[in-house]
């Protein structure tokens, strides 16, 4: 793919959604060839996550549900073992922590992919520019940014949970969830360019948020439509793969093999979806920023 012409085109006009998707897919193929280990690591952790949800996590959740049913049954309350409850609760909590850890690793790999993909798009292919790429890709700095971002996400998540609790005290639960959902989506629609700016530019989180609000004016649909389209493509691919896998391996009547194969296909689809979405988001961001800078000249 000719990235030089791509950059020139992004500086001269706004792309259509189809152009974002087509160019994004070409860069996706190029990125997979240049960074196979990075892509493979995302696939491995994605597969592990699906496997984790399919087997141990689901098993513990079912046991916890069965115990809750036992507690609700008045005839069986005398036979309740407190140690059994503590053991189940401890196991479930450990599973949640492990799930959170795998999720964090996946998000960190996605951040590295975003940074490397952004550098691939923006930088020229010669020895001097390759040196600039290495200088701009500083793992320590990216890690620090990631930790700050995750801390902010955690604070926002806890704040939303607290709001649900507070609103539930004065309103019914459905109304409380509706209000918090409105707050969540309001936040979501106002951070559409945040990650691209934060990880691709040398700015802090506050500066990135302000610039994100500036670029978002009239440009929210420009980034939302490609994301929605990729999500739909991913859904149909995932559905087709699961259907084919279910028919093929279901004949063996072996749930373990079915779970493993489904997890592997799920890992492939998730990696494709994340990588394709990240590249499309980067393209939209660069295009919007270049055109904004062009308008200021």
Go through each PLM region and give its residues.
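A generic signature of intrinsically disordered, low-complexity regions enriched in glycine/proline
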Residues: 46, 50, 54, 208, ...
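N-terminal entry module detector
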Residues: 13-95
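Juxtamembrane transition segments at transmembrane-helix termini in multipass membrane proteins
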Residues: 2-14, 60-86, 106-107, 111-125, ...
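Polar/charged alpha-helical tracts
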Residues: 5-8, 19-22, 26-30, 51, ...
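Interfacial aromatic "cap" segments that immediately flank transmembrane helices
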Residues: 13-48, 130-157, 187-237
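Hydrophobic alpha-helical transmembrane segments in multi-pass membrane proteins
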Residues: 38-60, 90-107, 145-188, 225-252, ...
